Every structure is written in structure tokens, then in C-alpha cells.
């Protein structure tokens, strides 16, 4: 990349195939703090584990203070040339919004001034201008990826999401947003988002939801029938994760509070940063969560049947004790 006598080093990347084909991608929860000193280990370990990843999803709070150039510089330096070779799908978290003064006038909480200049994201119609390049969708080799902005204007996004999902013909559907549908951090809850968005997620049986915000790890699912302990069919798989050093305690009741919403908690962790590798191949989606040392901590497989229903298959190997 360059012009005249000024050129960057050589960078390789691969564009998507036009047809359905297998691929892998990375998913990170909040990086947020001590990005260069701590998060650099996570993103580099992730690349080492999945060097052919097609893209990486960053589920919000990439930095701690929205408008600070220094923090964004740390985020880009921590990933180094990985950011140049592996496209990012960034999600706006609450820390991507901070009060902004313009000519001495307080404009209230505004999206990071660097966001739209450093990320080139797909435009989305039928949405307020304030959501531009924070709510978008794309398809990749048979999968539809949808990024939501869980900070604001949820009702407008719900109408847009309904339309996108009603027209969706992709085999796999993945939604990513910052605030989790089912909170895992102590003292946290996002009831409005759940009330507005979950009925749509359930209606269209979105396959996978990738979230952040709670600085803990949680994986759960919505069974087709809560009382059926034999049938392994599910509606959706939900994950909350964290990749940076900031950590919270887990909810004392786990996800028991959310049982009326039809969700079950399968595995959790505290005080542990993770990166995730997701493999998509035909009717199979394989989800794996790794610790910074590359050790596998959690894994599960989804099998999409011909009628569009999903079966969840536990990992064949022992994953060890919960942290």
C-alpha cells in the first residue's frame, strides 16, 4: 500500500469466495485496558492458533476511553500486522462512547471520533444517521454476520434486524453486540435489550450470539424445549467473553434468573482472558474458546439439519474444571 516512493511493507490478505466454502474466524471480548501490555498476548496467541482466520469479531470496548488517540494506537500496535492481514468486524461498546466538547460546547456522549475514519464498514439503510457504521451486516461464504449497537436506539435496530433476518438466506447466522442478552457479570442486566431483541432472535433462530461487556466468560443456549433433557436441539448459542485484563465476579445465581427466558448456562469462568476460534464447514459450526496459553477451555459443535433445525453436540474430550 502506498504511492510514489512511500510504500508499506508487503501485506497479504485473502478476499471471500463467491460461493459457499469452509472458513474460520476469531472472536474477542473486551480488550479495553492495558491493551499493548496485556491484550497483545491474546491477539497474537489467537493468530498463532488460527493463522488462516478469515476475519476477527471484536465485541465492543476495544479501548477504555473513546476519543483517546493513545489507546487506539495501542490497539493497532498490539495486533501489529495482524490487523493488516485479518479484517476486523468491530462492535461499538459503551467505552466507544464518551462525552465530547466541540468549541467548548458539551455534545454529550459521542461515538469515538476515530471510529469512522479508521474502520470502513458497510452502510445500512432504514436506520438513523447516528447508527451509521455501528450497525451493519455482511455475508461471508454462506454465513450472515450482523453487528448491532447495543448502546442506543434499540427499537430502530429491532425493526431493521427483523427485515434483515426475514430476507436472510444464509445457512448460518451470527449476531454480535456488546451488551449481552443474558448478563454474567455480578449486578448487571440488560433487560430492555432482552425485551426488544430476544423475540426476534428466537423467531428466526439465530445460530450464534457473540457478546462482551461483563468481563467474565459464559456459554449457554436456548433449548427448543427446556424440560427435554434428551433432545439436543437448540434455538441459539449465546457467548459472553473477555480478552483483556479487566475482570468482574460472576453473577451469584448464574443464569438461574433467566430460566423463564428459556436459557441454560453450560460453562463459565472468571478472571481469565480468552480468544475464540469458530470454524464453519457445511452443516457444522465448531466453537472453541482458548486461554492465553493456547489451552482449550470450552468447545461445542452445532449441526444444522436439512430442515433448518440445530443439534448441539458436546465436545468429545474432557475440558477440565471451571475456573
Labelled PLM ranges:
Residues 37-38, 114-117, 156-159, 295-303:
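A short, polar/proline- and glycine-enriched secondary-structure boundary/capping micro-motif
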Residues 22-23, 36, 94-98, 135, ...:
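Membrane-interface helix/loop caps of multi-pass membrane proteins
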Residues 168-209, 230-231, 256-258:
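Active-site-proximal segments of metal-dependent phosphoesterases and phosphodiesterases across multiple
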Residues 27-29, 55-61, 87-94, 148-149, ...:
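Active-site neighborhood of phospho(di)ester-bond hydrolases with catalytic His/Asp-centered motifs
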Residues 21-24, 51-56, 83-89, 140-144, ...:
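Loop/turn elements at helix/coil->beta-strand transitions in domains of secreted/extracellular proteins
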Residues 1-27, 32, 48-49, 271, ...:
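Acidic, histidine-bearing metal-coordination/catalytic regions of metal-dependent phosphoesterases
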Residues 1-12, 70-169, 188, 196, ...:
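Extended active-site neighborhood of metal-dependent phosphoesterases/phosphodiesterases
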Residues 21-91, 96-97:
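Conserved, compact domain cores that house catalytic/ligand-binding motifs in diverse enzymes
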Amino acid at each position: 500500500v502506498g504511492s510514489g516512493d512511500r510504500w508499506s511493507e508487503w501485506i497479504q490478505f485473502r478476499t471471500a469466495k463467491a460461493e459457499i466454502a469452509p472458513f474460520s474466524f476469531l472472536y474477542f471480548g473486551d480488550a479495553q485496558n492495558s491493551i499493548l501490555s496485556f491484550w497483545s498476548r491474546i491477539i497474537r496467541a489467537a493468530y498463532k492458533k488460527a493463522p488462516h482466520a478469515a476475519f476477527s469479531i471484536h465485541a465492543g470496548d476495544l479501548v477504555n476511553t473513546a476519543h483517546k488517540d493513545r489507546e487506539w494506537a495501542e490497539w493497532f500496535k498490539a495486533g501489529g500486522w495482524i490487523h493488516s492481514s485479518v479484517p476486523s468486524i468491530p462492535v461499538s461498546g459503551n467505552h466507544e462512547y464518551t462525552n465530547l466538547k466541540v468549541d467548548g460546547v458539551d455534545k454529550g456522549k459521542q461515538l469515538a471520533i476515530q471510529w469512522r475514519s479508521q474502520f470502513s464498514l458497510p452502510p445500512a439503510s432504514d436506520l438513523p444517521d447516528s447508527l451509521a457504521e455501528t450497525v451493519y451486516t455482511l455475508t461471508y461464504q454462506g454465513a450472515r454476520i450482523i453487528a448491532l449497537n447495543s448502546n442506543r436506539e434499540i427499537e430502530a435496530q429491532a425493526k431493521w434486524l427483523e427485515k434483515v433476518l426475514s430476507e436472510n438466506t444464509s445457512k448460518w447466522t451470527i449476531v454480535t453486540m456488546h451488551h449481552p442478552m443474558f448478563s454474567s457479570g455480578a449486578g448487571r442486566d440488560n433487560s430492555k435489550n432482552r425485551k426488544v431483541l430476544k423475540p426476534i432472535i428466537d423467531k428466526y433462530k439465530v445460530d450464534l450470539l457473540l457478546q462482551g461487556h461483563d468481563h467474565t466468560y459464559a456459554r449457554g443456549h436456548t433449548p427448543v424445549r427446556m424440560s427435554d433433557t434428551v433432545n439436543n436441539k437448540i434455538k441459539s448459542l449465546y457467548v459472553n467473553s473477555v480478552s483483556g485484563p479487566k475482570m468482574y465476579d460472576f453473577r451469584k445465581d448464574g443464569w438461574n434468573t433467566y430460566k423463564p427466558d428459556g436459557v441454560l448456562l453450560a460453562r463459565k469462568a472468571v478472571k481469565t482472558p480468552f480468544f475464540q476460534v469458530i470454524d464453519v464447514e457445511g452443516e457444522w459450526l465448531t466453537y472453541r474458546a482458548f486461554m492465553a496459553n493456547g489451552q482449550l477451555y470450552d468447545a461445542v459443535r452445532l449441526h444444522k439439519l436439512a430442515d433448518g433445525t440445530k443439534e448441539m453436540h458436546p465436545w468429545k474430550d474432557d475440558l477440565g474444571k471451571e475456573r
